[in-house]
């Protein structure tokens, strides 16, 4: 099911398509958000956090006639990578993840794949990213923000052109991700939110891993 279809035009030149899919990741939450971002002019696309149901993601990419350039993982947990192998095999695309969480893709004690009923995937990323790196999908630019806390290598993606933030499991609607898991830290996640994410423009739209997108400043700061 498609919850959001957003097309935006910047300066009459750049057209961005953003699709939010609800996929079954096998967790207690069951349905989680997977995002597809595409530059409509070049057809280049990026999938963010393919937590499950690879067929649903692939079907949408085919509908968009997308050229999958990147598969971006905000961190290494199993409920964010459930569709990773099939998606990579069938559509290509380079796997990107923050350098600190890269090891977790092949370490079930960090990825917690057993928790979501997955086998250990033993997969290495094609490239690693770090804080302030930039990623381009056609003419759309995203900046990597290292947001440790939920995991030590958690990251968020920010698009300054449209003030969009993909926050993974760091920031939700009025709350934050769990900090009782391997490599997680309560102090780190609060610092990531207060010192990095809350310093973005007030009208930034937050697209989290679960629940709805929002741009209500009060719900981002009343933590």
What are these regions (language model features)?
Residues 41-42, 52, 78, 101, ...:
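Short, glycine/acidic-enriched loop or turn micro-motifs at the edges of active sites
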Residues 52-136:
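Active-site HxH/HxHxD metal-binding segment of metal-dependent hydrolases
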Residues 12-64, 156-168:
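Conserved beta-strand hairpin/beta-sheet module of binuclear metal-dependent hydrolase folds
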Residues 45-48, 70-72, 144-146:
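Short catalytic-loop micro-motif centered on adjacent basic/acidic residues
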Residues 111-112, 140-223:
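Metallo-beta-lactamase
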Residues 2-15:
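Short, Lys/Arg-enriched N-terminal segments with co-localized hydrophobic residues
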Residues 14-21, 113-117, 138-139:
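Short Pro/Gly-enriched beta-strand edge/turn motifs at strand-loop
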Residues 46, 72, 95, 166, ...:
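Residue-level marker for buried hydrophobic side chains located in beta-strands
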């Amino acid at each position: 099911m498609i919850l959001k279809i957003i097309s935006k035009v910047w300066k009459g030149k750049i057209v961005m398509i953003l699709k939010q899919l609800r996929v079954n990741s096998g967790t207690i939450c069951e349905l989680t958000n997977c995002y597809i971002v595409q530059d409509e002019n070049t057809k280049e696309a990026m999938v963010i956090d393919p937590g499950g149901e690879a067929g649903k993601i692939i079907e949408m990419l085919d509908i968009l006639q997308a050229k999958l350039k990147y598969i971006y993982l905000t961190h290494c947990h199993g409920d964010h990578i459930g569709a990773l192998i099939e998606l990579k095999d069938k559509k290509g695309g380079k796997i990107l993840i923050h350098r600190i969480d890269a090891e977790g893709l092949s370490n079930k004690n960090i990825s917690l794949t057993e928790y979501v009923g997955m086998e250990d995937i033993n997969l290495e990323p094609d490239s690693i990213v770090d804080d302030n790196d930039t990623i381009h999908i056609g003419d759309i630019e995203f900046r990597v923000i290292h947001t440790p806390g939920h995991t030590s290598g958690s990251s968020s993606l920010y698009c300054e052109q449209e003030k969009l933030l993909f926050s993974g499991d760091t920031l939700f609607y009025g709350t934050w991700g769990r900090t009782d898991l391997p490599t997680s830290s309560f102090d780190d996640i609060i610092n990531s939110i207060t010192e990095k994410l809350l310093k973005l423009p007030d009208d930034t739209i937050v697209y989290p891993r679960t629940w709805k997108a929002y741009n209500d400043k009060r719900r981002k700061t009343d933590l």
